[in-house]
Amino acid sequence: MSENARDPRLVVEILSEALPYIQRFSGKTVVVKYGGNAMTEDTLIDSFARDMVLMKEVGINPVVVHGGGPQIGELLERLNIESRFVGGMRVTDAETMDVVEMVLGGLVNKSIVNLINRSGGKAIGLTGKDGAQITARQLRVEHQTPEMTAPEIIDIGHVGEVEHIATDLIEMLAARDFIPVIAPIGVDAEGHSYNINADLVAGKVAEALGAEKLMLLTNVAGLMNAEGEVMTGLSTAQVDAMIGDGTIHGGMLPKIRCALEAVKGGVASSHIIDGRVPHATLLEIFTNAGVGTLITDTASDVSPED
């Protein structure tokens, strides 16, 4: 720890800066998508768990939705099960889905729960199948080349999209001071399980809960402009325009769309933040500068003094 970090005056200054944010967001729900480097580096893992506990202690209700793609890939490799991808999505047959459930609903989920509990919180691990929280349907993937007269439907197995989020279980746990930790596995009316993109699940959970914030932890600093600077304080109209003119493209586009749709669906603000920064969630919520890209149509969300 640096000498500055030990300076009591600096500690008081930080707490003073955080106070209006704590007052404003107390009693609100914040949905956090946890993944990337923040999930694999020991220092970041510990800081994330402490962030969730601190949020709960100051009256904010965090809800965690996590990924686990690398961990799924590792176990599939150990079991000599080939991984195939179509459009960046894992082709998930019945055998692969069993592994997905074991990893997401078991290994990864309970590891996060344990970390939060060891940091002084009360976390409960769930999948979307518990309490039928996440009703899913199979995702239809279309492929078409210029030579084709019509697109073909590609069957990628047990990969789904969200049809409905039931919030009663999440709300009950949050009201009893628990921190829900949700694996992105959904179920359809026939009881079939589906692996769903964790960003999309987090966005839909945030919409269903009427959350104050959706926070997507990533391995980048945020949405960058042509000069390499992080853009923030963006409206949905601005983001739509940047998607339309090609300013936003490539790997960031799916996350931006997820964040955008959440705000359009009633979430006060979405944040794409740098999960490589220790305590990124607290820095984004409780400081004036933040550590990522904020998307909101609520002018006062940029600063509590506005």
UniProtKB/Swiss-Prot annotation:
Pfam families (UniProt xref): AA_kinase
The keyword Lipid biosynthesis is assigned to this record: no
Pathway where it operates: Amino-acid biosynthesis; L-arginine biosynthesis; N(2)-acetyl-L-ornithine from L-glutamate: step 2/4
Catalytic activity of the protein: N-acetyl-L-glutamate + ATP = N-acetyl-L-glutamyl 5-phosphate + ADP
Signal peptide location: none
InterPro entries linked: AceGlu_kinase-like_sf, AcgluKinase_fam, ArgB, Asp/Glu/Uridylate_kinase, NAGK-C
Compartments where located: Cytoplasm
Gene3D superfamilies to which the protein is assigned, alphabetical: Acetylglutamate kinase-like (3.40.1160.10)
Keyword Kinase: yes
Role: Catalyzes the ATP-dependent phosphorylation of N-acetyl-L-glutamate.
Protein name in UniProt: Acetylglutamate kinase
Taxonomic lineage of the native organism: Bacteria, Pseudomonadati, Pseudomonadota, Gammaproteobacteria, Oceanospirillales
The encoding gene: argB
